[in-house]
Amino acid sequence: EIFLVTKVQPSDFAYKRTLSAVRESFRKLDAGYIDLLLMHWPNPDIPVAETLTALNELQAEGLIRHIGVSNFSPALVQESMRHATIFSNQVEYHPYKNQAALIEQAKAEDYLFVAYSPLAEGAVRNDATLKSIGAAHGKSAAQVTLRWILQQGLSAIPKAGSNEHR
């Protein structure tokens, strides 16, 4: 089963541009619906309420099932939650990036925290501590890192390591 996720760019956060951009993505994807539509990066020039009004309409039309955000701070997630049901926040998270405030908020407010770049763009592979932990369990440093994220009750979307899989 495929869970189809796409994003609307900050340059398209104005109400009419959001409607147009998402409808164009929907047309290009040629799917019955989009499972999750993310607002990609905050745009300080356009209120989240404006974008979320458009996304709520698209959700009511059945084009999208869930609304999420990406790279939003706890305060901006809170503001977004006043205008829509927020399904997830996709943010950079790995052993070198502290996101404790967002993780705490995600658990308290019951939205999905999605860790992107969980392998720190490959840096975890050479981390002596992670390699040592992995060696003790017959696992790689990358496997240790992903397990650490999953054991926190979070979700992770690692990027492929080779260009042919990207």
Regions found by a protein language model. Name each.
Residues 12-14, 97:
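Residue-level signal for secondary-structure boundary sites
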Residues 42-166:
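Beta/alpha (TIM)-barrel catalytic core signal, keyed to glycine-rich beta->alpha loops juxtaposed to Asp/Glu
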Residues 1, 31-34, 64, 86:
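Local beta-strand N-terminus motif with an aromatic residue
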